[in-house]
Amino acid sequence: MSDQIYFFDTTLRDGEQCPGASMNLREKLEVARQMERLGMDVIEAGFPCISDGDFEAVHTIAREIKKCRIAGLARCVKADIEAAAKALEPAGERARIHIFLATSKLHMQFKLKKAESEILRMAAEGVSYAKQFVQDVEFPRRTLPAQTWTS
């Protein structure tokens, strides 16, 4: 395991969820440029499938920012992964698809109505599919029991 620490910023996506915190494309690009100047390792630029505006923001930031990895968020759904891959094309080797899937017991039981084994299968398939487009795929373990992910 590496001792290297990487900084991953979600301001352009997660930060926009705060009331009154939305940014237009120019503002997002300005923030991304400042993050680049500060030496941020990874910038999560948006959720490309959610709107044309988010797609364009991710695509523009992927094209303009040269020193950081650029991430696009996607659910474990082929259409989301494809939208993220398309938006991230200008980033080339710096592209990262950040996949998520509801994994808490409550979400699995009541929202997705799926067993843990099915969630694990969906996660593995989503990561494998994303790897067809980019080399860097992130899938955070969120509230699944630790024993599920041990080898």
Predicted regions and their residues:
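N-terminal amphipathic alpha-helix/helix-capping segment at the start of soluble metabolic enzymes
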Residues: 1-22
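Short, well-ordered coil/turn segments that N-cap beta-strands
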Residues: 2-5, 39-41, 66-70, 92-95, ...
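A short N-terminal beta->alpha junction/helix N-cap motif
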Residues: 16-26, 45-49
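Catalytic domains of carbohydrate-active enzymes, especially glycoside hydrolases
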Residues: 28-46, 88
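Alpha-helical scaffold elements within enzyme catalytic domains, especially in hydrolases
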Residues: 34-37, 60, 129
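Glycine-rich, proline-tolerant flexible connector loops at the mouths of alpha/beta enzymes
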Residues: 40-75, 102-112, 140-147
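Hydrophobic, small-residue-rich alpha-helical packing segments that form membrane-like cores
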Residues: 79-151
